[in-house]
Amino acid sequence: MEGQRWLPLEANPEVTNQFLKQLGLHPNWQFVDVYGMDPELLSMVPRPVCAVLLLFPITEKYEVFRTEEEEKIKSQGQDVTSSVYFMKQTISNACGTIGLIHAIANNKDKMHFESGSTLKKFLEESASMSPEERARYLENYDAIRVTHETSAHEGQTEAPNIDEKVDLHFIALVHVDGHLYELDGRKPFPINHGETSDETLLEDAIEVCKKFMERDPDELRFNAIALSAA
């Protein structure tokens, strides 16, 4: 992924909500913290939920799993509805923005956009593109890049040097046509995690998040935020 490099976004609802507002999304849906993965803490998350973003560490164990998963799907196949909006990641550290795009694009019918919304324009213009074409389109989309950079400086922790290697990565978990999809621009395709519904999306997405944590039990750097109706 050599080439463009952006500053990483924090998994911080204040940052992501402000970022989306600047891109012209009406705040009828807002990101909120998921404070824990047990039922009691999940019950504190406002419903309905239409997407979950997971921030996790890219470790050696994870990379081994990712390679095995990719090979298995390539040999066995999987069902992926054509309704899924998926894009590749070609910009280093842009995974936060790509996660947000995946979350909004796959729930576009639920969202309200302000007049002249940059994000709405990007989604409309890229609607018929391939995942690779969408990635290249984002590379040249200055309005989103500039907003991303502004948001990256607004986190609670100081933004790292732009050349610093970052081993944390965002993915989006969304419900499309009755199935739960993991959308990760580092992967060649969406991952179908089985059936879900609007009512059970949060719990089903958290089960996927738990698998990430179980693969790396010594790691603590996991953070989930949910896109909830405000």
UniProtKB/Swiss-Prot annotation:
- Species for this entry: Bos taurus
Summary of activators and inhibitors of this protein:
Inhibited by monoubiquitin and diubiquitin.
Q: What is this protein called?
A: Ubiquitin carboxyl-terminal hydrolase isozyme L3
Which reactions is this enzyme annotated as catalysing?
Thiol-dependent hydrolysis of ester, thioester, amide, peptide and isopeptide bonds formed by the C-terminal Gly of ubiquitin (a 76-residue protein attached to proteins as an intracellular targeting signal)
Which GO biological process annotations does it have? protein catabolic process; ubiquitin-dependent protein catabolic process
Write down the InterPro entries for this protein, in alphabetical order: Papain-like_cys_pep_sf, Peptidase_C12_UCH, Peptidase_C12_UCH_sf, UCH_AS
Chain's role: Deubiquitinating enzyme (DUB) that controls levels of cellular ubiquitin through processing of ubiquitin precursors and ubiquitinated proteins. Thiol protease that recognizes and hydrolyzes a peptide bond at the C-terminal glycine of either ubiquitin or NEDD8. Has a 10-fold preference for Arg and Lys at position P3''. Deubiquitinates ENAC in apical compartments, thereby regulating apical membrane recycling. Indirectly increases the phosphorylation of IGFIR, AKT and FOXO1 and promotes insulin-signaling and insulin-induced adipogenesis.
- Check the record and name the PANTHER family matching this protein: UBIQUITIN CARBOXYL-TERMINAL HYDROLASE, UBIQUITIN CARBOXYL-TERMINAL HYDROLASE ISOZYME L3
Where in or outside the cell is it found? Cytoplasm
